[in-house]
Amino acid sequence: MFRILSTGSALPALSKTNDELSTFLDTSDEWISQRTGIRQRSLCSDETLTDLLTVAARQALERAGVEPQQLDLILCATIRGEYITPSQACVIQQKLGAGCPAMDISAACTGFVYALDVAAGYFARKKVKKVLVLAGDTMSRLVDWNDRSTCVLFGDGAGAVLLGEGVSLQSIHLTAKGDPQLLCIPQPQSNSP
């Protein structure tokens, strides 16, 4: 299997508290925090998803003393990258100056766990020695800020985990409940086919 060598994270400077949301939504800090445990969320102003992911990735690499050229794979879990193509993982690979394969994983909120499972498969087949797993989103740009059932849940940020050979994680068991009635944020419409 693999072990975690280091981590990194990045949040935008702006944040919005539940009390601030209650000034324009029919809600309160108590209502939100009792149901979600969330008291505030970080929101991008000028920062991009690429900015956040790059900061988190560099932090994880620096903490482990690993150069980008030593990476064997970059996986990026995101609900919606900045581009249709290239993948968000490839954008970060270029920003870091890495030369390894890079791909996105799209599995909504559980994307990071799915990315870990993909990494576990590469480690099990002895195809990699160092894998950078990233997760990040800028959901504040997608949610309807008038819909209290969704906007109170999401913020912006990025995290990174650098994985290396070793034994720490014993197994991963994945499952899914694919009911869009549980939580649904529709894809924004465009004029393109």
Predicted regions mapped to residue ranges:
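Acidic, glycine-rich active-site loops and adjacent beta-strand->loop/helix elements
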Residues: 10, 77-82, 107-112, 135-140, ...
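Short loop/turn motifs at secondary-structure junctions
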Residues: 65-70, 122, 127, 168
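Phosphate/pyrophosphate-binding loops at sites that engage ATP/ADP/AMP, CoA/4′-phosphopantetheine
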Residues: 56-72
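Condensing-enzyme catalytic core mediating Claisen C-C bond formation in acyl metabolism
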Residues: 1-46, 147-193
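Conserved beta-strand elements of the Class I
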Residues: 3-5, 72-75, 132
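Flexible, glycine-rich active-site loops centered on histidine and acidic residues
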Residues: 124, 128-158
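Short acidic, glycine/serine/threonine-rich loops at helix termini
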Residues: 15-16, 85-87, 143-146
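Conserved catalytic cysteine-centered active-site region
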Residues: 33-35, 39-51, 79-131
